[in-house]
Amino acid sequence: MSYKNKVYVSMDADNDLHYYYLMKAWKQNDNTRFNFYDAHDINTILDKSEESIKRGLEERFRNTKIFVLLVGEHTRYLYKYVRWEIEQALKRGLPCIIVNLNGKRSMDSERCPAIIRDELAIHISFNAKILQYALENWPESYERKLKEGKTGAYYYTEDTYKGLGL
């Protein structure tokens, strides 16, 4: 069994890829604490067939411990890969962090894909501090809530955001 320490980031690559690149820039910035082990660094998928792409994505999932979904304006309409990635995360029981690119700090029912709206997940705004906080704290909370049989959308309180200076 492989050691799972990666963060798998799913997004609308046509419209929201720059947010993923911003996360990578935060990681490189010496002035932030932000850090994550990117599952997308595991392999490069060159073949453009759907079967080959999904095979490469499955390899990334095998080393993943946390699933992050960047939710933009069009995310809920994406079925070919984003929905498949969400299905994989849920099937594998990964803690899910849903990041609202519009700044909303709770579940955005208009943008969040239906497949994950009622699943156990934390919904946050797009910001390095709250995302780092979620990466560090949500997996343990997720496991506890899972054992308690809880489901549904969770979000951090305003006090949590204030404590982070947000």
Regions found by a protein language model. Give the residues of each.
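Anion (oxyanion) recognition and catalysis
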Residues: L90
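Glycine-rich, phosphate-binding/catalytic loops in enzymes
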Residues: A25-K27, W84-E87
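Conserved N-terminal substructure of TIR/SEFIR domains
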Residues: M1-N63, K150-L166
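C-terminal interaction surface of TIR/SEFIR-family domains
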Residues: M1-Y8, M107-L166
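Conserved beta-strand-loop-alpha-helix hinge of the TIR/SEFIR fold
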Residues: R60-I86, L94-K104
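Short catalytic/ligand-binding loop motif for oxyanion handling, primarily in non-cytosolic enzymes
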Residues: D16-Y19, R76-L78, K104-S109
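Low-complexity, flexible helical/coil segments
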Residues: D41-S49, L69-E73, L101-D108, Q132-N137
